[in-house]
Amino acid sequence: MIAGCNSMSNIDIPDLTLTDNTSQRLPCVLLIDGSGSMSGQPIDELNAGLKVLEDELKKDDIASQRVQLLVIKFSGDRDVEVLCDWTDAMSFSAPHVTANGLTPMGEAVRLALVKLEEQKARYRANGIAYNRPWVFLITDGQPTDDDWEQAADQSRSAEQAGKLIFFGIGAGGDVDLGKLARFSSRQPVKLQGLKFKELFLWLSRSTSSASKAAQGTNVQLPPPSDWMQVSA
């Protein structure tokens, strides 16, 4: 577990981050592709982007108290690892992501859905208001687990029920945007080159705006033109 990241997972244990800080929360899940194809410059740029996210959120007094981050890496065969459990942005330390193995994307999405419901139960138990959770899935390939379609259906159903907002981000020339689109009614988008820093800067600004919105209201997000590839 990375220093500065919360390792608490049992909802029966009092969570000091919620009793000490009773601010409304915006839960944000980052699902990070750590497969072998991300090795080299892609994973280096992604790690630099995570550091940008950490630094920018900590500069914002309100967002640093309200945005909660969960970082999950998927790689190996069916290896899904929580790199950073639910942590307020003020205490978030960007994890160092390494690259190896395959792309068990479905397994990561299933874990994210479970942990989101657990965290919402914590919020309710502590009287904490929260905005609709955000889930960001970043990949340069396609799912390699056999039952990924079931996870995609679960994600789409949760989104349609208003339980989350899902963003699919594809990087590199080998990403399968068609399969990524199965996880959400929102169309996935393509990263320009390796502009992970620009992506995470946009994410920090977007979550900052959303964290200040009243519960249940819509938020105008900044344009993603700095990092999103526009189809010809």
Regions found by a protein language model. Give the residues of each.
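Acidic, low-complexity intrinsically disordered regions
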Residues: M1-A232
